[in-house]
Amino acid sequence: MTQLEMAGQGRVTEEMKLCAEKEGVSPEFIRRGVEEGSIVVVRNNRHTGIAPLAIGKGLRTKVNANLGTSRDHVDLEMELEKVRICTKAGADALMDLSTGGEIRAIRQAIVNASTMAVGTVPIYAAAAEALNSRKSIMEMTADEMFQAIEENGEDGVDFITVHCGVTRESVGRIAAQGRLLGIVSRGGSITARWMDYNDAENPLYAQYDRLLEIARRYDMVLSLGDGLRPGCLADATDRGQVQELIILGELCRRARARDVQVMIEGPGHVPYPQIEANIALQKSLCEGAPFYVLGPLPTDIAPGYDHITAAIGGALAGAAGADFLCYVTPSEHLCLPNLDDVHEGIVASRIAAHIADIAKGYPGAMEKDILMAKYRSEFNWNGQIDLSVDPDRSRARLERSETAKEEGCTMCGDLCAIKLGKKKAPC
């Protein structure tokens, strides 16, 4: 039985209890959220070596980190080191987006190495297998696509991105309206090209019940992907994006009816004034399903600094109700991220998530900032470092200060405003 099926029967599972303890809420709160679809409990029934992860309404805003090989760069040891960095830097989940090398072996190694929930995009494996077999991606069969999904379930993958909303109708709306940058989702582009080449509907939409059977078998959460997300501000909130979201809302309801948990993926590149509206639209059309957003990025001109861009957009999106932030690294739009990029991306997204939690009134979020202020007032450097989002960097920066062991840092020295305010005698 799936988590959703048991929640519908009024049963609190062990996974729900573990999530409740971690979140500081009651197990019944988690159960009700799962039943209504506003919370998902993420853990494949074959991936029992990890703690389950709860994502959704009333819970802490979560952060995902992406990793994986490319067709041009295959280094499993580096990817496994990225898994370790994800754990140390405080990510809540990771996704293996590998497209190069022995995809299944890499996925299995990452799942086995991870102590957190693991997601994938199965169409990547299907496409890579087609290329490795010396045939065109366009020659993939529906059976091969579903076989890739089945293998992900067998390997213990906890959630999968599936671009079921990329249909002939939604792609047609993009063609009719026009876009500056076209389709920028890799899975979305593969699917759109496949439909055009084969003059056929997207198999993940046309055979959606087949997908639900696989997801139900392994209790994999479906992350309904935004294959038509905008890749630049000029394309944001256009007809193709909105039509896809309408379809995802309909598919979300069908999945719940089959006791399969669902979250929805969102943009992308969105002008700052449109971010809140995008969240509200998703929550309405998808009946409160958890929203998993990439950024969003409120400007297109910051390659090399897009972790900052994404954190700005992510903070607003999270405050408006987004539940799960996908990190963006400094390498976004430029190259495959290295180890430092992964760390930077996670920290930036965790900052955004914390800002969102303060705005949402999540219990304990504001208290951390109050405690930080107290530590600063007391010149409690160890307390400040331990509480900071990146203790290693905080400690390294402080140790560069000549007065690190005194009451003050090299920024102000004897002119420290806090020191001056505490003095009784004239300076």
Curated annotation (Swiss-Prot):
Chain residues that bind Zn(2+): 269, 333
Binding site for [4Fe-4S] cluster: 409, 412, 416
Keywords for this protein: 4Fe-4S, Iron, Iron-sulfur, Lyase, Metal-binding, S-adenosyl-L-methionine, Thiamine biosynthesis, Zinc
Cofactor: [4Fe-4S] cluster
Co-factor: note: Binds 1 [4Fe-4S] cluster per subunit. The cluster is coordinated with 3 cysteines and an exchangeable S-adenosyl-L-methionine.
Top-level EC class as recorded in UniProt: lyase
GO BP terms in the entry: thiamine biosynthetic process; thiamine diphosphate biosynthetic process
Cited InterPro entries: ThiC, ThiC/Bza_core_dom, ThiC/BzaA/B
GO molecular function, a single term: zinc ion binding
Catalytic activity of the protein: 5-amino-1-(5-phospho-beta-D-ribosyl)imidazole + S-adenosyl-L-methionine = 4-amino-2-methyl-5-(phosphooxymethyl)pyrimidine + CO + 5'-deoxyadenosine + formate + L-methionine + 3 H(+)
Pathway terms, separated by semicolons: Cofactor biosynthesis; thiamine diphosphate biosynthesis
Binding site for substrate: 66, 95, 124, 163, 185-187, 226-229, 265, 292
Pfam families attached to this UniProt entry: ThiC_Rad_SAM
Any single Gene Ontology cellular-component annotation: cytosol
Documented EC number(s): 4.1.99.17
NCBIfam families cross-referenced by the UniProt entry: PRK13352.1, thiC
Functional description taken from the UniProt entry: Catalyzes the synthesis of the hydroxymethylpyrimidine phosphate (HMP-P) moiety of thiamine from aminoimidazole ribotide (AIR) in a radical S-adenosyl-L-methionine (SAM)-dependent reaction.
Family: Belongs to the ThiC family.
Self-association state and partner proteins as the record states: Homodimer.
Listed name of the protein: Phosphomethylpyrimidine synthase
Source organism per UniProt: Syntrophus aciditrophicus (strain SB)
Gene for this chain: thiC
